[in-house]
């Protein structure tokens, strides 16, 4: 066996007298135990592709070397790494003794480095009684300085990133800490001396016979003015509530603490109230002096007359259609939807009222234009020119009810000219009282005034119904949940009728063409023209009969 693994080695030679080339003799020879041992000692031939095999471990070399034994080398390596691990554990133990887990201390609440800062930050602004201005200012300044130093210096003296002896800020901080410690030590030394010098309470030296006397003494000599808490000044603290929020009923209100400069002091409020009272009294006295005896008391009769002459004041309220505000603590979403629906309806009503007012203004303007045109037309007519009924249309906006007014006015104009007969076919029986003596006057000048019927024409007071017009609201149509029950919603959907706005501006386009709003007015106008033709024919007939000497019956009122 080779001494080293890297040295090449060969198989041992065959025994003497053994012919390997002759297979027959090999099979015929008898093998003994010695041959079997030699066969076992012969190593196996390594394949060409495999690396050379190592020597057998159980075969001992001629001279044993501990460095060449793999087991010995492994034992040495294990012991070496065990020593390194032990040294590392000892070093970590030494570091752990010097190391402080600050995160764990903060979690446990035992961090000693920031006790002073935490004490100031937690108790400076939460006192039962408000401190004085100087104490408040000094505490706030000290707290602000500690915060800035902690941010700038990166912690306390032991763990700061600044270099000792080179940073001026660190030097100032160390000096301030030394000065504060010396001051605290001096106060602690002086405190026992002051306690010893403190006298006893004078109340203990005085003997009181009654409890009333003791209470009087305490009220006179030991009463102290209570210090006010600055947070409870008038107007200092207020509640902030978001009214636009849908869940404002259940939300917790936010408290707002105003600055002391924004809050008025008690002295200023008292002075202001006193000045207001004095000024109001002086104003009242001066008004009495200016009026003198004019403002004397009236007698009962004069007082009654004065009250009768005084017109009643109109109660003008610009918000009369809105209603009173009734706050409620619990509102369901259904109530909120109902209120929104009512608000939308009120907005629509206001829009409709404005549109109606604009339409009335336009109608008045058109009426003025018609009056001016009639005046000009009247000036152009000749004095004895007869009216052309068929050629000149009349602008009458009134419906069929305007005929009664027209006949009544004609009766007043032509009273006494002729009798009343044959007009029953034109009028209803109940209209006879209104017509009166249609031809009462014989000296009628109706034919001399061709523009009389134009003067009698009046416009209709009927307004266009804009309730069905689509106002163009952006809030959209009403849905099922805007109504309380299904019946109300069904009734609304059955009666809903909305026309586009263009239908009221340009009319509705039908099969025979576009018909505007004047369509109904032209029909009334044609009906009025037909009735006027019949009345004119009756007037002519009565005139001829009266000219021929035929007696004509006159109606009685």
Curated annotation (Swiss-Prot):
It is found in: Nucleus; Nucleus, Nucleoplasm; Chromosome; Cytoplasm, Cytoskeleton, Spindle pole. The keyword Heme does not apply. It comes from the Eukaryota. Transmembrane segments: none annotated. The modification Phosphoserine is found at residues 287, 417, 460, 536. The keyword Ubl conjugation applies. The modification Phosphothreonine is found at residue 485. Residues 16-25, 304-313, 332-398 have a biased composition (Basic and acidic residues). One of its GO terms (cellular component) is cytoplasm. Residues 342-375 are annotated as: 17 X 2 AA tandem repeats of R-[ED]. Ubiquitous. One of its GO terms (molecular function) is identical protein binding. Its main location: nucleus. Involved in pre-mRNA splicing as a component of the spliceosome. Auxiliary spliceosomal protein that regulates selection of alternative splice sites in a small set of target pre-mRNA species. Required for normal mitotic cell cycle progression. Recruits MAD1L1 and MAD2L1 to kinetochores, and is required to trigger the spindle assembly checkpoint. Required for normal accumulation of SMU1. This is Protein Red. It comes from Homo sapiens.
